[in-house]
Structure formats: C-alpha cells, structure tokens
C-alpha cells in the first residue's frame, strides 16, 4: 500500500523525467535497489559473501539477424551469405589446379586408322564332321573292322535317287507365269477326271 502513494508522488517530484518506467527498465531499477539494500544490510557488513549471480543473457530473439522478421535483419543475413559465396568463388578462381589444359592442334598427332586392323571376334563354332573323320572313328572300333569290304550296299543304292534329280535349278518366279502353269495343271487334271467318269458311265 505504501508503494502506490510513492508512485503517485513521483511525477509531481520530477516532472516529465520522473515518469514511471515500464518493462525492462523498471526491472533493472528494482534489481539495483535490491542490490543496494543487500550491500547496506548487516549481513554484508559482517563479511558474508553473497551467492554468485547466475549468468544473464543480454539481448533476446530480436538480436539474431538471421531469425529476425524485420527487413533489416533479412538484408543483413543476405549480405552475410553473399559475402560467404564471394569468398568461395574467389578462392576457387585463385586455384589453378582444377583448370584442364587443352592441347594445341599442332601437338596432337593424327592417328592413321587405315593401317590399323581390328582383331576378328572369337566365336566358338561346332565343327561339322566330314566323311573322312567318320571313317576314322568307325575304324577305331574293333567290332566294325571285320565288316570292311564285306558290306553290300546294292539294296541301299536302288532306293536312293541320283543327285541331278534332287537338285533344282534356281529360276526366278513370275506371278503371271506361275498362274498360267497352275491353272493349266488344274485344267488337265479336271479333264482327266471328267474322261474317267464318262468311261465309267458308258460301261454297262
């Protein structure tokens, strides 16, 4: 109750300069008054050491330029980032070890590709056995050696057709020519069938 009249009398005493302080300033004045009262107390005069003060952080979230929402804080953060990028770019430009060296055309020797021959590909192919190889394999077996010169192949040769009858000449096919040949063969077969039917009908 006593503090209220003192606050009311403060503007009367000091005028405009003695206006009550609000917020952080008022807390600082209160802490200063408490420190003075502790120093003047009899415990301080007896030599008792006051407890150590906890570390006090100066400033607040507004002091961080990166996290500040104001335009000035953003500009400051952008300037810091630009400064870092500029330093890196200058350091990279000073270092000449990463720059590749391009040779001149005179130093490059033209390779003669015409004289170079590519190696043939190695492909595994199953070799076909010839008759000579087959005869050698046949002679290895002792069971077939007794038949040498005694085998009669006349029955087999009677059934086999000669080579010139099996091979056909390469003839180019024409649509009109093929059509006429097929149609003529069909007509001849039809005529033969008709004549055979007439013969069967005429017989009693």
Swiss-Prot record:
It comes from Taeniopygia guttata (Zebra finch). The keyword Cytoplasm applies. Residues 1-12, 75-85 have a biased composition (Basic and acidic residues). One of its GO terms (cellular component) is cytoplasm. As a component of IFT complex A (IFT-A), a complex required for retrograde ciliary transport and entry into cilia of G protein-coupled receptors (GPCRs), it is involved in ciliogenesis. Involved in retrograde ciliary transport along microtubules from the ciliary tip to the base. This is Intraflagellar transport protein 43 homolog. One of its GO terms (biological process) is intraciliary retrograde transport. Belongs to the IFT43 family. Residues 1-103 are annotated as: Disordered. Keywords: Cell projection, Cilium biogenesis/degradation, Cytoplasm, Cytoskeleton. Component of the IFT complex A (IFT-A) complex.
